[in-house]
Regions:
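Boundary/entry segment of secreted carbohydrate-active catalytic domains
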Residues: 1-18
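A short alpha-helix capping/helix-coil boundary motif
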Residues: 1-3, 36-40, 106, 212-215
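Structural preference for beta-strand elements that scaffold enzyme active sites
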Residues: 2-6, 33, 67-71, 135-140
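A short, structure-level motif marking secondary-structure boundaries and short turns
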Residues: 6-8, 43-45, 112, 219-220
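Active-site beta-loop-alpha junctions enriched in small/polar residues
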Residues: 10-12, 39, 75-79, 141-146
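Flexible, glycine- and charge-enriched loops at secondary-structure boundaries
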Residues: 12, 16, 49, 53, ...
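Aromatic-lined substrate-binding rim segments of carbohydrate-active enzymes
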Residues: 20-101, 116, 123-131
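Polysaccharide-binding and catalytic clefts of secreted carbohydrate-active enzymes
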Residues: 100-125, 129-228
Length: 228
């Protein structure tokens, strides 16, 4: 089977006057695919609810008419500052409890419901607008999912979500979970670490010495489930 080659392209970085020439040169080099859009949330939605698709429409059309297949990325790895201003508690925390702030990418906690809702909104709008576009031949969900150790967060939001996850993993009567089943599974008789209810459970960091390995394992499994 013949292999095809592609390239990442960021039309939002360049003046529109050079897009056609860029597309032509890509095709002349033998490229078949072009990925765009994965970091362009702010360009697509400058402020909440105000969308600018015109530049993206034009870029996709130019690339497609040049004979290139477009891979459209969802821009969910780079929420704009206005998202953070709306949800200041959406930032993740590292194992030392330090906030991982705005200024690069992946500045959010996967557990945060507000961030999730904003992602659903922009992804849905992109899908409706470009889902049947003949030049959009593939989609990329997010970008480098979980890199920079961002699957793990020690924020209060993550703690609350972890407690909910544990209640489902160790079910009891109703929605309260079985805390004794958790204590037994984690071996919490050691070092007097037994809990009386799930709301007592914190994240496995900032302890005097090594946290309970079973606690760490469940926290890692919870974190993995969030991005599964």
């Amino acid at each position: 089977m013949k292999q095809s080659l592609g390239v990442c392209y960021y039309p939002e970085h360049w003046d529109t006057s050079i897009w056609e020439n860029d597309a032509r040169q890509m095709k002349e080099l033998g490229l078949s695919w072009v990925r765009i859009g994965e970091f362009a949330w702010k360009e697509i939605e400058p402020t909440e609810g105000q969308f600018n698709f015109e530049w993206l429409d034009k870029a996709i059309k130019i690339l497609g008419q040049a004979g290139l297949k477009v891979v459209l990325g969802t821009p969910t790895a780079t929420p704009p500052k206005w998202v953070l201003d709306k949800y200041p508690d959406m930032l993740s925390k590292d194992i030392n409890g330090n906030i991982r702030g705005f200024g690069s990418r992946r500045h959010y906690c996967f557990s945060h419901s507000g961030y999730i809702e904003q992602c659903k909104d922009i992804v849905t709008r992109l899908a409706k607008r470009y889902g049947k576009n003949p030049y959009v031949c593939a989609w990329q969900t997010d970008n480098e999912y979980g890199c920079h150790d961002t699957t793990i967060s020690y924020s209060d939001t993550a703690r609350d979500a972890f407690r909910t996850w544990l209640r489902y993993k160790y079910p009891g009567k109703g929605n309260d979970g079985d805390i004794e089943a958790l204590n037994k599974e984690w071996g919490n008789v050691f070092w007097s670490m037994k809990y009386d209810n799930f709301d007592e459970i914190n994240l496995p960091n900032l302890t005097v010495t090594e946290p309970n390995p079973a606690h760490i394992l469940d926290f890692r499994r919870f974190s993995s489930d969030q991005v599964a």
